[in-house]
Amino acid sequence: MQFAKRLEKIPPYLFAEINRKREALIAQGVDIINIGVGDPDKPTPAHILQAMREAIDEASNHNYPPYEGTQEFREAAVKWMERRFGVVDLNPNTEVVSSIGSKEAIHNTFLAFVEAGDYTLIPDPGYPVYRTSTIFAGGEPFTMPLKAENKFLPDLDLIPEEVARKAKMLWVNYPNNPTGALATLEFFEELVAFCQQHSILLCHDHAYSEMAYDGYKPPSVLQIPGAKDIAIEFHSLSKSYNMTGWRIGFAVGNAYAIQGLSQVKTNVDSGVFKAIQKAAIAAYNTDEVELQAVMSVYQNRRDIIVKGLQSLGWPIEPPKATLYVWVPVPPGYTSTEFTTLLLDKCGIVVPPGVGYGVSGEGYFRIALTICEERLHEAIQRMQDAGIRYS
């Protein structure tokens, strides 16, 4: 028995050593504070649970769902896109498809459009799935560095013309994981123009569209005139509605891109349980006041972490979106060295920035997914251990 050669190209799990040490410390009785995982700790809102309970009792929901999602779900997604972003004239029959979360749809889009010899343009640092899915599809990832001096936006001028000519897809994710960076409509206009010029499929991973603070509302790339000619956007209910385990979302945009994604999906999965789609419809009709109440919890946690780190000398500002704070490591450390120090000295688990790509070196990521008391305790442990930025 032998693994396929493609697995040899998949990088090893970069956090394996940290996980090994974490388990060893837990076995020794050490109280570990894990702020490394972007998995919301709050329950799914009650009205979504109620919609699920009612849908489970309907026998008509117990058989196979439509591959592309129920008509009701796709229409709800279209209405939400119009209500939330002002994106109109989306066709629920040809420009929307349900997905099992967004990770599945992201991966299957690579399989639909990338072949051997094709480039994919992916952000670095970025969601690791962009790179691994490129490799699974037989393509070649070309990384676009995200640098602080460019507000963690890719510089399109740095993409060589010979690479752009062979590129099939360009991936962006704003609000951004792991950096928390934002994109403006003006930047989206640049992306659309670049992808139109080079006949590249523009893919926007919008998993954090509702995870925003201080009154900020992240835009959709589909707000740009002409974007639907070359763009597809991926939405997920996982983070915004505390539904990571439910595995539900949708892809929306260019009809040809949706067709390609759907063709892969119909051959590898059987859709999303119809009762979960009913619950998702309830989620997309969540009252804005209730949604903002959820966001206020994460905003408060953000403020605890940012103020705490500032008190220890860190030169950081509060991010306006996502579940994360992207933090520079103190001078003299690599990201892996510093995250190992936090684990050994403080019992704090955070991922090193290099785990998200070589351009993530020099940073680590904090997830705002544990209670306020434990966040305060994490800062206190760092202070007690004498860990400061400078």
Curated annotation (Swiss-Prot):
Molecular function GO terms recorded: L,L-diaminopimelate aminotransferase activity; pyridoxal phosphate binding
Positions contributing to substrate binding: Y13, G38, K103, Y127, N177, R365
Keywords: Aminotransferase, Pyridoxal phosphate, Transferase
Matching Gene3D superfamilies: Aspartate Aminotransferase, domain 1 (3.90.1150.10), Type I PLP-dependent aspartate aminotransferase-like (Major domain) (3.40.640.10)
BP term (GO), one: lysine biosynthetic process via diaminopimelate, diaminopimelate-aminotransferase pathway
Residue(s) carrying N6-(pyridoxal phosphate)lysine: K239
Subunit relationships: Homodimer.
Family: Belongs to the class-I pyridoxal-phosphate-dependent aminotransferase family. LL-diaminopimelate aminotransferase subfamily.
Protein name: LL-diaminopimelate aminotransferase 2
Organism: Trichormus variabilis (strain ATCC 29413 / PCC 7937) (Anabaena variabilis)
The organism's taxonomic lineage, starting at the top: Bacteria, Bacillati, Cyanobacteriota, Cyanophyceae, Nostocales
